[in-house]
Regions:
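Feature marking well-ordered beta-strand scaffolds used for ligand recognition
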Residues: 1-170
Length: 170
């Protein structure tokens, strides 16, 4: 995911999925200006892969995918001691996360592993230890659709002021 890397306050934050063993494993690494690791969270969602991430303020929100499809919230306010705060398992998976407002994250992806339904999800993250799926919308998809939002986040319109969400689908 192109949003799984972020620079803030002289630190580089990276959310890689490693496939070196029998199962993928995820982690959060914090590097200083000399590229020394100063903070880490290891062993996040073993057997799954990170599909979407968004760094906002002192938090990083990310979605993994395989058997279960959780939204994770991690606190990165202290670069030397990042903490995993909350997790919410939901059906489907998001390919893109967008901060809707101070307390809501919009997820755009699929409602099932066959990608037969596009899924819009609104997460309430006002309590980062207990994220909640407050709304979802499933839209029928088909093999002939070209869901550009999966590869190009610029194909998504998310306008909280006008309460609009749009994306391309051919």
């Amino acid at each position: 995911d192109k949003f799984a890397i972020n620079e803030k306050g002289g630190y580089l934050y990276v959310l890689p999925t490693s496939n070196t063993g029998s199962q993928p494993v995820n982690s959060l690494h914090v590097l200083d200006k000399d590229m020394n690791e100063v903070g880490v969270i290891n062993e996040i969602a073993r057997g799954e892969s990170i599909y979407a991430a968004r760094f906002v303020g002192k938090y990083v929100y990310f979605i993994t995918y395989r058997q279960t499809d959780p939204l994770f919230v991690a606190d990165i306010s202290n670069p030397t001691a990042p903490k995993l705060l909350g997790e919410l398992e939901v059906s489907g998976f998001s390919e893109y996360l967008h901060m809707w407002d101070d307390t809501h994250v919009l997820g755009i992806g699929y409602g099932d592993s066959q990608q037969s339904k596009i899924k819009l999800t609104m997460f309430d993250v006002s309590d980062p230890t207990k994220p909640v799926e407050v709304n979802q919308k499933l839209i029928d998809s088909s093999e002939s659709w070209s869901n550009e939002f999966v590869y190009n986040y610029k194909a998504i319109l998310a306008d909280p002021e006008k309460n609009l969400i749009g994306f391309t689908a051919n």
